[in-house]
């Protein structure tokens, strides 16, 4: 009998581990940089894919062993698209990314390497929460573990990019939310003029009782408050403040031309979700329990456009199939077509 219980416990533990995720690779402008999750790679990778659940732990910064640098640093420049590729086990096409029960937001932070390693200077540059009946993690799974950001116009130097998932399937109890994060080493080679704000400390940016951390995703709710600071708009130099109770706009599926991949990499036919965020429109009402991902991505995040009249602000949607909002961008912006379903206002 004891043996049976032991086997059941081991099976349950194995199932839990298999549901977790880490970042395995990065793409720059749709070019695969190869696996980066090793000591000779470019991702500060933890020894396993277990989550961090104590928001006061030093491991919140870059995960376990995250203070240790790795061999490589990726070169990027302002305006480059950086795509993070998450998996729970491997880059194989059959990998399920993360358990479908692990719904929650996806965010990206950036900090100068020295300050970031010490847990300071973290600036949120992208986030996606819950919108139009789907969680950010559902979109991530549909996109085969990929989501993207645009490198801001910051001064040249070495930085850390910190993609993060908060899984809320146990978020209805204090200490139940699961945090997954790694730090990617990058070197910005362009001479930008927009200095990052002072940022926040991690640990320190979250509390166990924050509404977006202690959150019951199984009860009826009308909005999800993404925790942490507000997203930096990429131009101001002020301090990152606290985020409000609505998820930020996130550009849906970006059009991607698959680049040659290194041997053993996963199928790259899915297009990553592109996060380019500036403002936070109000989220729509959510059902008591979020629907499961269908495996296709028809948009990740609110359009943020409001009504069909008026000028559309930077980084918000301005066109695309089935889109009925405003199509005229504010002065100095142009409506860029990412794919037939999503057009976005960007600097001309």
UniProtKB/Swiss-Prot annotation:
It is an enzyme of class 1 (oxidoreductase). PANTHER family: ENDO-BETA-1,4-GLUCANASE D, PUTATIVE (AFU_ORTHOLOGUE AFUA_1G12560)-RELATED. Binds 1 copper ion per subunit. Belongs to the polysaccharide monooxygenase AA9 family. Cu(2+) binds at residues 20, 102, 180. GO terms for molecular function: cellulase activity; cellulose binding; metal ion binding; monooxygenase activity. The gene is eglD. O2 binds at residue 169. One of its GO terms (biological process) is cellulose catabolic process. Disulfide bonds join 62-183. Residues 1-19 form the signal peptide. This is AA9 family lytic polysaccharide monooxygenase A. Has a modular structure: an endo-beta-1,4-glucanase catalytic module at the N-terminus, a linker rich in serines and threonines, and a C-terminal carbohydrate-binding module (CBM). The CBM domain is essential for binding to and subsequent oxidative degradation of polysaccharide substrate. PROSITE patterns: CBM1_1, CBM1_2. It is found in: Secreted. It catalyses: [(1->4)-beta-D-glucosyl]n+m + reduced acceptor + O2 = 4-dehydro-beta-D-glucosyl-[(1->4)-beta-D-glucosyl]n-1 + [(1->4)-beta-D-glucosyl]m + acceptor + H2O. Residues 233-306 are annotated as: Disordered. Its cofactor is Cu(2+). Glycans are attached at residue 322.
């Amino acid at each position: 009998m004891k043996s049976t219980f032991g086997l059941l416990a081991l099976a349950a533990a194995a199932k839990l581990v298999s549901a977790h995720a880490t970042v395995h690779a990065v793409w720059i402008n749709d070019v695969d940089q190869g696996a980066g999750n090793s000591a000779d790679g470019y991702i500060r990778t933890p020894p396993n894919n277990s989550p961090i659940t104590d928001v006061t732990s030093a491991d919140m910064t870059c995960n376990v062993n995250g203070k240790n640098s790795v061999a490589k640093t990726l070169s990027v420049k302002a305006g480059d698209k950086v795509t993070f590729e998450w998996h729970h086990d491997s880059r194989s096409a059959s990998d399920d990314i993360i358990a479908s029960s692990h719904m929650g937001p996806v965010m990206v932070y950036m900090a100068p390497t020295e300050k970031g390693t010490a847990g300071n200077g973290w600036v949120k540059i992208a986030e996606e929460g819950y919108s139009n009946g789907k969680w950010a993690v559902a979109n991530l799974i549909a996109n085969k573990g990929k989501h993207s950001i645009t490198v801001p116009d910051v001064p040249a130097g070495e930085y850390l990019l910190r993609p993060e998932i908060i899984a809320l399937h146990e978020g209805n109890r204090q200490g139940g939310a699961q945090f997954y994060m790694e730090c990617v080493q990058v070197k910005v080679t362009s001479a930008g003029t927009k200095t990052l704000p002072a940022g926040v400390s991690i640990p320190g940016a979250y509390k166990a009782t924050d509404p977006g951390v202690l959150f019951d995703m199984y009860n009826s709710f009308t909005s999800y408050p993404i925790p942490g600071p507000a997203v930096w708009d990429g131009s101001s130099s002020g301090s990152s403040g606290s985020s409000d109770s609505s998820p930020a706009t996130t550009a849906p599926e970006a059009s991607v031309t698959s680049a040659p991949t290194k041997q053993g990499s996963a199928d790259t036919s899915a297009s990553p979700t592109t996060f380019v965020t500036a403002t936070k429109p109000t989220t729509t009402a959510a059902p008591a329990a979020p629907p499961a991902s269908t495996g296709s991505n028809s948009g990740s995040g609110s359009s943020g456009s409001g009504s069909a009249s008026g000028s559309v602000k930077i980084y918000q949607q301005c066109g695309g199939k089935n889109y009925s909002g405003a199509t005229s961008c504010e002065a100095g912006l142009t409506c860029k077509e990412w794919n037939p379903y999503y057009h976005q206002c960007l600097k001309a």
